[in-house]
Amino acid sequence: MSPKKLPKDPIYNRVRVLRAERDMTRIQLAELINVNPQTVGALERGDHSPSLDLAFRICEVFGLPVEAVFSRTEFAPMSKELY
C-alpha cells in the first residue's frame, strides 16, 4: 500500500466536537448530509477535505457559518474561546 498523500494546505474542522455536543452518531450525521459514515470519519480525522457543497451541508446541519466549522488554521479549544 502506498503512503497516504496529505493535502498541502489541510482544512481543519470541528465536525467531531460539534457532532459529540449534539449526541449525534456518525451514522446520523452521514444520513443528514447524504454521505457514508466512513466519509464522516475521514473528515473528522482530517483524511478527507470536503467539497464546498458538502461543507455547506454540514454547516446547515449544525446551524453554523462555514468559518465556525472549517478553517485553514488549527482551531483553539472551544473552552478557550468561550471563557
Indicate residue ranges for each PLM-predicted region:
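A short, Lys/Arg-rich alpha-helix, primarily the initiator
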Residues: M1-E21
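Residue-level detection of the helix-turn-helix DNA-binding "recognition helix"
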Residues: A20, N34, R45, E74
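Short, charged recognition helix plus adjacent turn
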Residues: M1-K5, E60, F70-Y83
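Short alpha-helical DNA-recognition segment
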Residues: D23-A42
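Alpha-helical residues within the helix-turn-helix
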Residues: A20, E31, E60
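DNA major-groove recognition helix of helix-turn-helix/homeodomain DNA-binding modules
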Residues: D53-A68
